UniProtKB/Swiss-Prot annotation:
UniProt record similarity statement: Belongs to the type II (or gamma) interferon family.
Keyword flag Cell inner membrane: no
Annotated protein name in UniProt: Interferon gamma
Tissue specificity as recorded in UniProt: Released primarily from activated T lymphocytes.
Quaternary context: Homodimer. Interacts with IFNGR1 (via extracellular domain); this interaction promotes IFNGR1 dimerization.
Functional description taken from the UniProt entry: Type II interferon produced by immune cells such as T-cells and NK cells that plays crucial roles in antimicrobial, antiviral, and antitumor responses by activating effector immune cells and enhancing antigen presentation. Primarily signals through the JAK-STAT pathway after interaction with its receptor IFNGR1 to affect gene regulation. Upon IFNG binding, IFNGR1 intracellular domain opens out to allow association of downstream signaling components JAK2, JAK1 and STAT1, leading to STAT1 activation, nuclear translocation and transcription of IFNG-regulated genes.
GO CC terms in record: extracellular space
Principal location: secreted
Glycosylated position list: N39, N106
One Pfam family from the record: IFN-gamma
Subcellular location(s) of the protein: Secreted
Gene name for this UniProt entry: IFNG
Length: 175
C-alpha cells in the first residue's frame, strides 16, 4: 500500500508538469520526500502499469481534458485526506495541496472549498439522493451545449431582404 501511495503522489506531480504547470524546487523536494517515505524506488512499484497517466493521456485528444483532470485531482485529495494523520509527510502534502490551489483552482480557496464540499457529499444518504435527483434536470441543462440553444441570426442583406447591397452577391449590386 505504501508504494502505491508514493506512486500516486509522483503521478500528481507528473500530471501537473505535463499540463503546463511549472514545478518549483520546493514542490519537487516535497515529492522526493514522499518518494522516500513510501519507498517508491522499489522494483515492484511499477507492477501493473501506470495508475492514472494512461487514462489521462487518452483524454488529451479530446477538448474535455478538465473533466478527467478534476477526477484525478479528486482522487489525490482523497488520498491526501487518508494520509493527513501521518506527521512525517504532513508538510509535503500541504505543499502539494497549495500547488494544486494555485494551478488547478487558479489560487481561489473558494473554488477549492467548493470542490472539496462536492467531493465529500455522502452519496449513500437518502436525503442527499432525493436532493440530487431533484437538481438533476438543472445540472443536465447547464451541461448541455450552449450553441444548440441559440438560434442563428441571419443577415437580411445576404438574402435580398435588406436595403444595403452585399458586395459578395452580384445580384444585390445596383446599376
Amino acid at each position: 500500500m505504501n508504494a502505491t501511495c508514493c506512486i500516486l503522489a509522483l503521478l500528481l506531480c507528473l500530471t501537473q508538469a505535463i499540463s503546463g504547470c511549472y514545478c518549483q524546487g520546493t514542490l519537487i523536494e516535497e515529492i522526493e520526500n514522499l518518494k522516500k517515505h513510501f519507498n517508491s524506488s522499489s522494483s515492484d512499484v511499477g507492477d501493473g502499469g501506470e495508475l492514472v497517466l494512461d487514462i489521462w493521456r487518452n483524454w488529451q485528444k479530446d477538448g474535455d481534458i478538465k473533466i478527467i483532470e478534476s477526477q484525478i485531482i479528486s482522487f489525490y485529495f482523497k488520498l491526501f485526506d487518508a494520509l493527513k494523520d501521518n506527521q512525517a509527510i504532513q508538510e509535503s502534502i500541504g505543499t502539494i495541496e497549495q500547488d494544486l490551489l494555485v494551478h488547478f483552482f487558479n489560487s481561489s480557496e473558494e473554488k477549492r472549498d467548493d470542490f472539496m464540499k462536492v467531493m465529500k457529499i455522502p452519496v449513500d444518504d437518502p436525503q442527499v439522493q432525493r436532493k440530487a435527483v431533484n437538481e438533476l434536470l438543472g445540472v443536465m441543462y447547464r451541461l448541455s451545449p450552449k450553441n444548440s440553444l441559440r438560434k442563428r441570426k441571419r443577415s437580411r442583406c445576404c438574402f435580398g431582404g435588406g436595403a444595403r447591397p452585399n458586395k459578395n452577391n452580384a445580384a444585390s449590386k445596383t446599376i
